[in-house]
A protein has these predicted regions:
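Sec-dependent bacterial lipoprotein signal peptides
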Residues: 1-5
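Short helix/turn-capping signatures at newly exposed starts of structured segments
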Residues: 7-122, 163-173
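A charged, solvent-exposed segment within the mature domains of Sec-exported extracytoplasmic proteins
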Residues: 110-173
Length: 173
């Protein structure tokens, strides 16, 4: 006698399709695009036309106090950063050598949190959530990014790059 038996199993639940892969970030999300000259470069060797700006700040914890730095803004085109032209782009020198770069970009409020998280995740080489610290060191350069909401409902992302080695001890070029 031949016996057939079968198992009854519930219908498999439909599996949601995976989320489509996100497009790679624009190359301008990498903070290295802001380095138009190596840290330690002499002011006259920077390949841009610059004008001096006066900074008035009350900040603590930076590599060099603001009063020790001479900062310059660029006359003309600025390097694109997070797919935008920076509203502020400063090259700061200590003892006539490049020691800090700072850039600020305006972000649309509805995309600001995502852009900040994407950029910071790229810089730190790991996913980050909004509000997490976005600072580190890479290749002898310290970086710190921060995000601010503006009263007009826009947002801005600022990054500061500092030479890990003091500019006044950089090798002669």
């Amino acid at each position: 006698m031949l016996v057939l038996s079968a198992c009854a199993a519930p219908q498999p639940k439909p599996v949601a399709p995976p989320e489509p892969a996100r497009a790679p970030l624009d190359a301008s999300y990498d903070w290295r695009v802001l380095l138009v000259a190596p840290f330690g470069s002499v002011l006259k060797d920077v390949p841009l036309t610059l004008h001096e700006v006066l900074l008035f700040r009350d900040e603590a914890g930076h590599a060099a106090p603001a009063d020790e730095l001479e900062c310059y803004a660029v006359d003309g085109a600025r390097p694109r950063f997070v797919a935008r032209s920076p509203s502020e782009y400063l090259l700061c020198f200590k003892h006539d050598r490049l020691s800090r770069v700072e850039a600020t970009v305006q972000l649309p409020a509805e995309e600001a949190v995502r852009i900040y998280a994407d950029a910071c995740g790229l810089w730190l080489k790991k996913p980050v959530g909004f509000g997490e610290e976005c600072a580190g060191t890479d290749g002898g350069i310290t970086f710190a990014g921060h995000f601010e909401n503006e009263p007009d409902e826009s947002a801005q992302l600022t990054i500061q790059l500092d030479a890990a080695e003091p500019a006044d001890s950089a090798p002669e070029r």
